[in-house]
């Protein structure tokens, strides 16, 4: 039977290093205020009728990592604060700007009129793979 240390060593690239997950206090993150003022990726996310609080929290966490502009929460999609959402958002619901809007279709139309290029993310007939997508860095996007 392998020890925990031996198991960890087997799953690292170098046998002399044990990888350890950093604590939030060790990440040297900027403050919420600094995050709000920081440059953002010209991308917004529109979530429509998402039931899973964990999925919503995960989108917040990803949005925080990529410093996206905003998340639009539409329809029955829950809004912060919520303890179940916080479990996966890990505080990103405080850093990422978000807005609740009832109607996703109107929101997408408004974003389009503001110059956003809109893409839908779905596994569907006729869709393209993400690695085949080419983005123009001079444009703003909504997904």
Can you annotate each of these PLM segments?
Residues 1-143:
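Post-transcriptional modification and biogenesis factors for structured RNAs
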């Amino acid at each position: 039977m392998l020890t925990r240390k031996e198991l960890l060593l087997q799953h690292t690239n170098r046998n002399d290093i044990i990888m350890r997950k950093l604590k939030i206090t060790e990440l040297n993150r900027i403050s919420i205020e600094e995050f709000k003022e920081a440059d953002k990726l010209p991308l917004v996310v529109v979530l429509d009728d998402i039931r899973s609080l964990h999925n919503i929290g995960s989108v917040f966490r990803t949005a925080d990592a990529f410093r996206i502009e905003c998340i639009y929460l539409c329809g029955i999609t829950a809004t912060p604060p919520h303890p179940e959402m916080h479990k996966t958002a890990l505080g990103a619901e405080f850093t990422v700007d978000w807005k609740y809007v009832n109607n996703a279709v109107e929101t997408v139309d408004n974003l389009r009129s503001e110059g956003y290029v809109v893409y839908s993310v779905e596994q569907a007939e006729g869709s393209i793979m993400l690695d085949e997508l080419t983005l123009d860095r001079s444009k703003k996007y909504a997904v």
